[in-house]
């Protein structure tokens, strides 16, 4: 008989830098998960993606064991890196903070494709393009 899931925890953590300090410690501690073991395993699986925020979905079972699934980095983080900006515009419809090329958009869409609700790359590009527009990043050819 499969183990029963008691909690599903979603966190967005810096790759290779998870520590037992908040937000990890309190989120996992209240469900009885071994925090140090999770941090060590997460850091080992994300070392090659240093500098990015990697969302993680942790399933906690009734015997206090856990499994976790790593998601793709948020499109906003990938776009900010591609445009070489720290953060998006406070007023995206008036102030543009950077620009990305169509090729960079396609590359980001390919990275994000497994986590998007589409299977077609053209739709994924449009989704990422909308995120760029909302951040005040222009798309150039």
Swiss-Prot record:
Domain of life of the organism encoding this protein: Eukaryota
Known function: Forms part of the ribosomal stalk which helps the ribosome interact with GTP-bound translation factors.
The protein's name: Large ribosomal subunit protein uL11c
Gene Ontology, cellular component aspect: chloroplast; mitochondrial large ribosomal subunit
Principal subcellular localisation of the protein: plastid
Family under the similarity heading: Belongs to the universal ribosomal protein uL11 family.
Subcellular location: Plastid, Chloroplast
SMART domains listed in its UniProt record: RL11 (SM00649)
InterPro entries the record matches: Ribosomal_uL11, Ribosomal_uL11_bac-typ, Ribosomal_uL11_C, Ribosomal_uL11_C_sf, Ribosomal_uL11_CS, Ribosomal_uL11_N, Ribosomal_uL11_N_sf
Gene Ontology BP annotations: translation
Subunit structure comment from the entry: Part of the ribosomal stalk of the 50S ribosomal subunit. Interacts with L10 and the large rRNA to form the base of the stalk. L10 forms an elongated spine to which L12 dimers bind in a sequential fashion forming a multimeric L10(L12)X complex.
GO molecular-function term, one example from the UniProt record: structural constituent of ribosome
Keywords linked to the UniProt accession: Chloroplast, Plastid, Ribonucleoprotein, Ribosomal protein, RNA-binding, rRNA-binding
Pfam family, one: Ribosomal_L11
Species classification: Eukaryota, Sar, Stramenopiles, Ochrophyta, Bacillariophyta
Keyword Ribosomal protein: yes
